[in-house]
From Swiss-Prot:
Subcellular location, record wording: Host cell junction, Host plasmodesma
UniProt xrefs under Pfam families: 3A (PF00803)
Stored InterPro entries: MPV
Keywords: Host cell junction, Transport, Viral movement protein
GO CC, alphabetical: host cell plasmodesma
Function: Transports viral genome to neighboring plant cells directly through plasmosdesmata, without any budding. The movement protein allows efficient cell to cell propagation, by bypassing the host cell wall barrier. Acts by forming a tubular structure at the host plasmodesmata, enlarging it enough to allow free passage of virion capsids.
Regions of compositional bias (Polar residues) in chain numbering: 266-281
A biological process term (GO) from this entry: transport of virus in host, cell to cell
Family: Belongs to the bromovirus movement protein family.
Name of the featured protein: Movement protein
Superkingdom classification of source: Viruses
Location of the region described as Disordered in the Swiss-Prot/TrEMBL record: 256-295
Length: 295
């Protein structure tokens, strides 16, 4: 087990992958296989909200996310402590997270009053002051009306794997709504991306201020070409919808479908690429007439 120096359990993102590690003796291998299996990945995702947006509701001022799931963190703590007591590793383990990137998007109107404060925290601080405070100035406040934006945090140290006042110590993200008025609707959504590693050797890192990048909302009408704009207008005015059989029409008078180029919801508006499609109403009759077979 002495060859364990670092483990990469997962990345917290919408494309979360777990890298299996085959290290140490047979007992350690069994434990690691269990911790990094596909079944474990599902547990990580469920407990940490990996790959999912966190909804910020008006009636819930505070939200917290641990950057390592509780069950997985406890297993790592137990494994490293056991190997440390045997003299196989130089420490009982630390959690290393180089950086955390958060994407915030507004789900309320642009004149919504209030702001969001986001903090990178170390859960040990809750045992001292009953309040999760930002570590090393890793805190940023943004007005709801200024969204969308991206925020980056970076801790200056590795978090020790240990229990403090009966709670597992871990890095986490806290979001706090300020001055938001409402009865429970979602005012914004947050998606966090990060990479977690477990190491036996701790480190310290240069202190940097939180970085924020505001994103200009997409102006559909300004960015579309004349052809795309024409298709867009036809689409929203229902001129391109196929309503199927019309009352009073005969089988010989049914008009053929017309393909209209419209803005593709999955294509990049900047590239000018659009997809050719025909819209239809669910449940409407199909107007296509089968061609007669030649004998």
């Amino acid at each position: 087990m002495s060859n364990i120096s670092s483990l990469n359990p997962f990345s917290g993102s919408s494309r979360t992958l777990v890298e299996n590690k085959q290290v140490g003796a047979s007992d350690a291998e069994s434990l690691l296989k269990e911790m990094f299996s596909l079944e474990a990945q599902k547990e990580y995702a469920k407990e940490c909200n990996l790959g999912r947006y966190t909804e910020l509701k008006a009636n819930r001022r505070l939200n917290h996310i641990d950057l390592v799931p509780k069950v997985h963190g406890m297993k790592m703590l137990s494994m490293f402590r056991s190997e440390y007591d045997k003299g196989n590793v130089p420490s009982s383990g630390v959690l290393n997270i180089p950086r955390i990137l958060l994407y915030l998007v507004r789900t309320s109107h642009s004149s919504t009053v209030g702001s969001i404060t986001i903090r990178l925290v170390d859960t040990y601080s809750a045992s001292d002051s009953c309040l999760l405070e930002a570590i090393d100035g890793q805190e940023f406040t943004v007005d709801l009306s200024s969204l969308p934006c991206m925020i980056g945090f970076s801790p200056t140290y590795d978090c020790k794997l240990e229990m403090v006042d009966g709670r597992r110590r871990c890095f986490g993200i806290v979001t706090e709504l300020n001055g938001v008025i409402g009865e429970g609707h979602t005012v914004a959504m947050v998606h966090a991306y990060w990479k977690a590693m477990f190491r036996t050797k701790p480190g310290n890192y240069t202190r940097v201020k939180p970085a924020a990048k505001f994103i200009a909302p997409f102006d559909r009408l300004k960015q579309l070409s004349s052809g795309q704009l024409d298709a867009f207008i036809k689409g929203i005015s229902n001129n391109s919808i196929d309503h199927g059989y019309l009352m009073g029409s005969t089988i010989n008078n049914i008009k053929k479908k017309t393909n209209v180029k419209e803005e593709s919801p999955t294509s990049d508006p900047q590239s000018g690429e659009v997809s050719s499609m025909t819209q239809s109403v669910p449940g409407a009759a199909d107007t296509r007439i089968p061609k007669p077979r030649r004998r």
